[in-house]
Amino acid sequence: MINAFRGAIASLLFAPVAWSQSTLPTAAEVIAKIKGQAGIEMKPTTVDTFKAGDPSTRVTGIAVTMMATLNVLKAAVARGDNLIITHEPTFYSHRDTIAVLESENDKVLATKRKYISDRGLIVWRFHDIPHQMKPDIIRTGIVRALGWQSSFHAEDQEVFDIRRASVRALAKEIGEKLGARAVRISGDADAMVSRAVLTQGFPGFVANRHAIQRGSPDVVIIGEDHEWETIEYVVDAISAGQIKAMIVLGHIASEQLGMDEVARWLRPLLPGVRIDFIPTPDPFRFSR
């Protein structure tokens, strides 16, 4: 009886609410709704916090993005969105720490903060929660975009048995599907591969190494990493004949469409609030 009562209360608290134009939610109300729906216990060290703006501001629209660059902010303003939900930092460090840049009167920081302030934008980071969701909603979006839903191992969602293809063809296909303009290959680009380990963003050397050990892949696909850690490790594994090749996508491309998945997840939760997915362009391209 008590559990049933608690369940009823929870369903009322976190059920979709259609706001009218005159009673648009505040940014704080929107974020509370998101946290409640995700059901993830927040750690004191989480980076999923407001980074700029007044959370009591009423939301005219939500821009969901991989990275709140100045160009993305301008695109959000053009659409009439004032709440920016970004996966990655806004102010150039994991915790958006700005004290040093402020003390140096950094012009880039000042320009961005002024733009946010002048237009009444609110920026909230959505990084830890999506990766802790079951399944990881960022990974879900990438797997959907690649069409690999039936290819991953049930016991390890970083390991995929994929259609046999050359490394070159695989890199081209992934780049096109994920919007990566500067995909890099290490190893034999003409080698045929069918078992992949895919990690996203920047999980770090330990996580990448463990995924490789678990998956025993012939191709490793990553977002980014230090060249003296995962990159060097895989280069040595290629030299030793343990792996055929590595594909490096770039951080943004390796997670971007996961935020498109987030936008899809948010729309039924927040009816009456416009939600736009605004892609962050791959910052790199080849010089030739």
What are the roles of these predicted feature ranges?
Residues 1-9:
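Bacterial N-terminal signal peptides that target proteins for export
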Residues 15-17:
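N-terminal signal peptide c-region/cleavage motif recognized by signal peptidases
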Residues 20-288:
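Active-site catalytic microenvironments in core metabolic enzymes, especially phosphate/sugar-handling
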